[in-house]
Amino acid sequence: MTVLYTSASLKKMKCLAFNMGMNCVRTVSHARSGGAKFGGRNVFNIFDSKTPDSVRIKAFKNTIYQSAMGKGKTKFSAMEINLITSLVRGYKGEGKKNAINPLQTNVQILNKLLLTHRLTDKDILEGMNLAAGPVNVAIPRDITPQEEKKKVELRNRKAENMDLHPSRKMHIKELLHSLNLDMCNDEEVYQKISLYLQKNEESRTSVGASQQNHVDIDINSLKRYLQNIEKKARQKSAIDKQKKNQARIYQWNTQSFSEIVPLSAGNILFKREPNRLWKRLQNGISVFLGSNGGGKKSKTTKKVLQGNNILLHSLENNKDMTLSNNFDHSVFNINFTDLFGVINASGSPPDRVLNEINEIELKGWKCVGNLYDNNKIVVFQSSNPLLEDTKIPQKSFTNSKRFLISLSALLASFFAYYRYRLSQRQESKK
């Protein structure tokens, strides 16, 4: 086996060659790159995009390591200081704690991040590109005292509009105008809104003594509250209109509409007596032909629901309101549900609600549900039984049948007499 011995001179030559290679990697002509002093020596500019990225990153890491270990006095340029500071601040967990650290502390932190591989080459390259990019710095002009005064007034005005004060009546009117609410009685609306704000103020007294004179109101909640007031006002006006219409009842001549007659001035102004003989003849012919009119109509029982009246019962004040079947029920949003649904949604003791419902149902009403927007109001409908149309009496039907038979016999006799006279005339001519 051959053993090779390396002399000391050969080792020295290898070390010199290695150091020369490192210097070749680190150094480039200062005049060629237009560089600056980096790490205290005339080396290339690491922010030069013409230099390969790997070479720039490697040179930057080596200089940070040398400066952190205290090997020589390092002088960094302004761009390099910005790069070091941005890398330390940009790393997650180090930015806020070391935002105002001195340069040497930032170098120590950056070296630690590089050694633990928590900072990648991609992060270093992005930081170099950002630091080397052009920065537009616009120097703001001086603000005049008049402009500063206007800015303060505008800020105070915005802060004032954000608050709602119950003691200010004009502010409530402005809010109603912004919500496009056309209320007839502004005083009543103002009193209700003020009471609503006062309740909110009393409920917020536990927050703190400094906030007792300040009321923070949700605009959406206030808008829904005002919409409920407007809806109740529409319902009240509809009920009043329905009551006025009930007071004006006209006595129309129902006999003139019992049969289809041609429309004319005489039919409108004067009472028209129906022809009873012709009507009886029509009924008799209808029965004889087996049509659906006349007597056969009496066999078909037509069901008519008598009593569609609505009763609204309030569980709060125990008051009732009755609406006739001519009233437009679409104004009220009725929730049709069973008895258990009404009791559960009322929020009142079940025994009391059940007793009130039973008392009203004993008067001939039937519980059908409640109102969607107010579960305290129970809706009832009159529960009168289905009545049948009155049948034509059997005597009237018999009389019509007799009249029809008599008329048929009369026509047959007339036809037979006509044939008899015709045959006699023909015989006399012969």
Swiss-Prot record:
Where found, per UniProt? Mitochondrion; Mitochondrion membrane
What stretches pass through the bilayer?
A: 403-420
Please, which domain of life does this record's source organism belong to?
Answer: Eukaryota
Q: Where is the transit peptide?
A: 1-27
The UniProt keyword set, sorted, is: Membrane, Mitochondrion, Transit peptide, Transmembrane, Transmembrane helix
- Classify the protein's membrane topology as the record does: Single-pass membrane protein
Per the annotation, which location comes first and is thus the protein's main one? mitochondrion
Any GO CC annotation of this UniProt entry? mitochondrial membrane
Q: What induces it?
A: During M phase of cell cycle.
Kindly list the cysteine pairs connected by disulfide bridges: none
Task: Describe the subunit structure.
Answer: Associates with the mitochondrial ribosome.
Q: What does this protein do?
A: Component of MIOREX complexes, large expressome-like assemblies of ribosomes with factors involved in all the steps of post-transcriptional gene expression.
Protein name per Swiss-Prot or TrEMBL = MIOREX complex component 4
Task: Please name the source species.
Answer: Saccharomyces cerevisiae (strain ATCC 204508 / S288c)
